[in-house]
């Protein structure tokens, strides 16, 4: 049986002090709810890079992820953080190509591919994000857009070492969400375009109310969660599937 994976994406939230407070509370609540969490579940939080050192306060099975990384190995790239630096801090996952990176920082599929290659080279698992805008969705171009992103973002990539996260852009932080059936349809398409054993996550207004239905879909292996991962109690509810 393949692992189920839940990754919380904190985006640009929480100070270093607030992050330490989160882990202190999480450690206790995890102990209280440990028996409700499926042993086949892997889970992580993607912190702002400046807060990664606070992860040392974690004493649970929780893994460490980041929200971005450099496409370059090392050198004169002011402000960048390399995969080697992240690996040295025990980072397991790197979110790559999130729609906010593509939208606000003009990241291209070429950039995403280069970062993905760097992550794999340094034994970090890349979580490559794909998804369509509201305009593309309404124009019924979802499959076309996803196919193009997959083709270019995953060019020459070993698919056994990558995770793909489908996040319909129109459902990120909007309170809207694709129905489990809609999400399944696109994730099934992603699997058809890639590899039958690929790990596929769904993201986009995932909450404790809808996560179980989403994870019951045949081609959804986990979730990439935004706002619901920022509070200890709601994150624990996600891990226990609201039990």
UniProtKB/Swiss-Prot annotation:
Provide the gene name from the record: tpiA
- Pfam families given for it? TIM
**Protein name per the record:** Triosephosphate isomerase
Q: Organism source for this protein?
A: Mesomycoplasma hyorhinis
What residues bind substrate, as annotated? 9-11, 173, 205, 226-227
Q: Name one GO biological process term.
A: glycerol catabolic process
Location in the cell:
Cytoplasm
Provide the assembly information: Homodimer.
Question: Matching InterPro entries, A to Z?
Answer: Aldolase_TIM, TIM_sf, TrioseP_Isoase_bac/euk, Triosephosphate_isomerase, Triosephosphate_isomerase_AS
